[in-house]
């Protein structure tokens, strides 16, 4: 009898989902990681908690801080744990909007882009792109020297910080200020920004947590 009731219930769910795919979905509250304040980011729908894991969410820093100057900063988070109707995330990347980056480059200036892979002291491996703009045109040798200094500063800063400390320096503009100082020792700088960050590899404990949580969710639903 119990098996028959289960079969009927399953058929009813299928029928409902065919009529209205949203009928069986629940809304989950998604939060930023603790090292970014653990603030509420958004509500997202899903039929099952497991289907949220590894989903990427993009917001602006303005959505978190309500500071209008943070509108050009896009943040990407990846859901990696679900507890009931609450989902927690880990940082996945950062990028400045193209319009903002274009606004920094003026006629008669030089653009220097430095891209390097860094590793934080707690094991996060990331690719960081730094954009520097000089006040006037500079030669190839100066560009190379500035690029080298940018890479040295970013690599050193990352190696000395955990992910939370590193992102704090990026989002508060401290790292950009240090890069500006490093660059202007070679040529006058107009602006320096951390243009993009992409997580290439998470620390082992971050990966274990994600897999453990997926397994736990699957076990609970079986």
Curated annotation (Swiss-Prot):
GO terms for biological process: translation. InterPro entries: Ribosomal_eS1 (IPR001593), Ribosomal_eS1_arc (IPR030838). It comes from the Archaea. The keyword Membrane does not apply. The keyword Ribosomal protein applies. GO terms for cellular component: ribonucleoprotein complex; ribosome. Keywords: Ribonucleoprotein, Ribosomal protein. One of its GO terms (molecular function) is structural constituent of ribosome. Pfam families: Ribosomal_S3Ae (PF01015). HAMAP family: Ribosomal_eS1 (MF_00359). Belongs to the eukaryotic ribosomal protein eS1 family. This is Small ribosomal subunit protein eS1. It comes from Pyrobaculum calidifontis (strain DSM 21063 / JCM 11548 / VA1).
């Amino acid at each position: 009898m119990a098996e028959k009731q289960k079969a009927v219930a399953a058929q009813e769910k299928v029928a409902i989902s065919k009529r209205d795919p949203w009928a069986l979905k629940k809304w989950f509250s998604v939060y930023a990681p603790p090292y970014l304040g653990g603030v509420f980011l958004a509500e997202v729908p899903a039929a099952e908690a497991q289907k949220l894991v590894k989903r990427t969410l993009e917001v602006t820093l303005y959505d978190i801080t309500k500071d209008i100057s943070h509108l050009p900063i896009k943040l990407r988070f990846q859901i990696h744990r679900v507890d009931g109707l609450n989902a927690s995330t880990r940082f996945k990347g950062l990028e400045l909007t193209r319009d903002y980056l274009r606004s920094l480059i003026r006629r008669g200036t030089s653009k220097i882009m430095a891209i390097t892979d860094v590793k934080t002291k707690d094991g996060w491996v990331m690719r960081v792109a730094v954009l520097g703009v000089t006040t006037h045109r500079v030669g190839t040798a100066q560009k190379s020297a500035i690029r080298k200094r940018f890479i040295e500063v970013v690599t050193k800063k990352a190696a000395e910080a955990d992910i939370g400390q590193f992102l704090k320096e990026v989002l508060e503009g401290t790292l950009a200020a240090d890069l500006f100082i490093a660059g202007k020792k070679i040529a006058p700088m107009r602006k320096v920004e951390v243009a993009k960050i992409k997580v290439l590899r998470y620390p082992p404990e971050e990966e274990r947590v994600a897999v453990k949580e997926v397994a736990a969710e699957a076990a609970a639903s079986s």
